[in-house]
Amino acid sequence: MALRPARCYRTTERRSYTRKEYVRAVPQPKVVHYVMGNSSVEFPVEVQLISKSDILIRHNALESSRIAGNKYILRECGRTGYLFNIRVYPHEILRENKMAAGAGADRISDGMRLSFGKAVGTAAKVKKGQEIITIGVNPEKFYAAKEALRRCSMKLPTACKIVVTKGQDLIRD
């Protein structure tokens, strides 16, 4: 069955659902790596991608964002010239009450009886002003980090802003 659109799970009004011991099978998050690049070096410039609204970000959106940003920053800075860090983890469990469609579906379907749903994925609950991704680089690669975060934000379901949190005085305009 196809993946339900993200707009079905985007809002954060509903209560959190994170207790894995009550759920039979929770799908593993698609995010493979949370820290990429050179983690042994302290970089002088740090740039962050910050959410502008409260939202749930699905694990596949986080993974596609990670791939897009990491691919660009790796090409620009090399393997040891950056630190890419995803700051959120998809704890929220997303459920779906699957409905049969087509001819004769009314005989097969249970409708809204036992409509709790099965776990179909996970999502990260992000608040307004929370950091989603952080990139650390040297001052000469600041614009590459900024472009990588812009590419990351294109894959996420919320408006984001890019903020320099460390090393503002080292950046030349």
Curated annotation (Swiss-Prot):
Database matches in Gene3D superfamilies: Ribosomal protein L10e/L16
PROSITE patterns assigned to the protein according to its UniProt record, in alphabetical order: RIBOSOMAL_L10E (PS01257)
Gene Ontology terms: cellular component: ribonucleoprotein complex; ribosome
InterPro entries linked to this entry: Ribosomal_uL16, Ribosomal_uL16_arc, Ribosomal_uL16_CS_euk_arc, Ribosomal_uL16_dom, Ribosomal_uL16_euk_arch, Ribosomal_uL16_sf
Annotated Pfam families: Ribosomal_L16
Keyword Ribonucleoprotein: yes
Domain of life: Archaea
Gene Ontology BP terms: translation
GO molecular function terms listed in the Swiss-Prot or TrEMBL record: structural constituent of ribosome
Keyword tags: Ribonucleoprotein, Ribosomal protein
Family, per entry: Belongs to the universal ribosomal protein uL16 family.
Protein name: Large ribosomal subunit protein uL16
